[in-house]
């Protein structure tokens, strides 16, 4: 099929790679280059870089105006495929392809509609998630469901690891969806909007560890935000990102207070419920390190506290 593909982050690269080996991708639409990092270096999206490497035509519109509409119309797509593009499509664009627009969404809709379904489901401690292929409408992930595939969530998995798994599944599922779409056998099941939950974009405050929360909630926050953007706390006036932790058995101390900091008992910090065993962390301006290396270098004392 002749396809216009819309996507931006790394999650959207795997489906695009799969599509170009099975279909004709006539045009790729992605977000414009943007400044990122401390040096504010201008970088291209992963989808743009992949498309250029594979000699695909790419456009990076700031908004959907008449010029963009005409560019998409000119390639005569049979279907538009979207994966984490980052913008809602106006009706004029949705109405261009005769087979409609399909979205690859990283949750089991109607749950976790929105921009950050992977992080939000991990932060909530969900045991299951998946991929949904849906027919797009003008709403935020409100269209009819075509296909879904469930994935059990290992309680140690990180956001980055889950994203890779879901990208692979999404790539396979969109190929199956397009095959059935062309054959006339792709289902359309309306969502139960009363069951809808939402996954809003991550904010800076989502990165802050609140030690009054339970150890399980903090552990879920840490793994959800690994590797980007990371969850952090403050120790001796400086930020420290915590990359890996597990729930411990100790409780009864002030939240944030160091309970143990030795090789026998590990690095245990009190929370609002139980203790949090810190396994891997990264001081501001430094490299990731094990808890043992942190103890050797910083010598934290029992009774010292991590700030919220």
From Swiss-Prot:
GO terms of molecular function: methionyl-tRNA formyltransferase activity
Alphabetical UniProt keywords: Protein biosynthesis, Transferase
Biological function: Attaches a formyl group to the free amino group of methionyl-tRNA(fMet). The formyl group appears to play a dual role in the initiator identity of N-formylmethionyl-tRNA by promoting its recognition by IF2 and preventing the misappropriation of this tRNA by the elongation apparatus.
Ligand binding ((6S)-5,6,7,8-tetrahydrofolate): 107-110
Annotated gene: fmt
Protein known as: Methionyl-tRNA formyltransferase
UniProt feature coiled coil, ranges: none
Organism of derivation: Carboxydothermus hydrogenoformans (strain ATCC BAA-161 / DSM 6008 / Z-2901)
PROSITE patterns: GART
Reaction(s) the record says it catalyses: L-methionyl-tRNA(fMet) + (6R)-10-formyltetrahydrofolate = N-formyl-L-methionyl-tRNA(fMet) + (6S)-5,6,7,8-tetrahydrofolate + H(+)
InterPro entries xref list: Fmt, Formyl_trans_C, Formyl_trans_C_sf, Formyl_transf_N, Formyl_transf_N_sf, Formyl_transferase-like_C_sf, GART_AS, Met-tRNA-FMT_C
UniProt entry tagged with the keyword NAD: no
EC number from the UniProt entry: 2.1.2.9
GO annotations of cellular component type: cytosol
Superkingdom classification of source: Bacteria
Family: Belongs to the Fmt family.
HAMAP family named in the record: Formyl_trans
């Amino acid at each position: 099929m002749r396809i216009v593909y819309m996507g931006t982050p790394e999650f959207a690269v795997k489906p695009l790679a799969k599509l170009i080996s099975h279909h004709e991708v006539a045009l790729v639409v992605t977000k414009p280059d943007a400044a990122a990092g401390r040096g504010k270096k201008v970088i291209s999206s992963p989808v743009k870089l992949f498309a250029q490497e594979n000699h695909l035509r790419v456009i990076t519109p700031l908004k959907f105006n008449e010029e963009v509409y005409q560019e998409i119309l000119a390639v005569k797509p049979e279907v538009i495929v979207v994966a984490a593009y980052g913008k809602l499509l106006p009706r004029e664009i949705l109405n261009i392809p005769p087979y409609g627009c399909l979205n690859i969404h990283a949750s089991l809709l109607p749950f976790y509609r929105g921009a950050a379904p992977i992080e939000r489901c991990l932060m909530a401690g969900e045991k299951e998630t998946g991929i949904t292929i849906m027919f797009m409408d003008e709403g935020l992930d409100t269209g009819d469901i075509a296909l879904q595939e469930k994935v059990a969530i290992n309680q140690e998995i990180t956001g980055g690891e889950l994203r890779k798994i879901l990208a692979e599944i999404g790539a396979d599922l969109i190929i199956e969806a397009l095959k059935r779409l062309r054959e006339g056998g792709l289902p359309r099941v309306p969502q139960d909007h009363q069951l809808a939950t939402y996954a809003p974009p991550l904010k800076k405050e989502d990165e802050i560890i609140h030690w009054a929360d339970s150890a399980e909630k903090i552990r879920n926050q840490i793994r959800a935000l690994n590797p980007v953007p990371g969850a952090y706390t403050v120790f001796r006036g400086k930020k420290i990102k915590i990359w890996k932790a597990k729930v411990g058995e100790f409780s009864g101390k002030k939240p944030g207070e160091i309970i143990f900091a030795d090789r026998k008992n590990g690095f245990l910090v009190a929370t609002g419920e139980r203790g949090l065993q810190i396994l891997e962390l990264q001081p501001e301006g430094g490299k990731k390190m094990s808890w043992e290396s942190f103890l050797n270098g910083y010598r934290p004392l029992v009774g010292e506290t991590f700030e919220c």
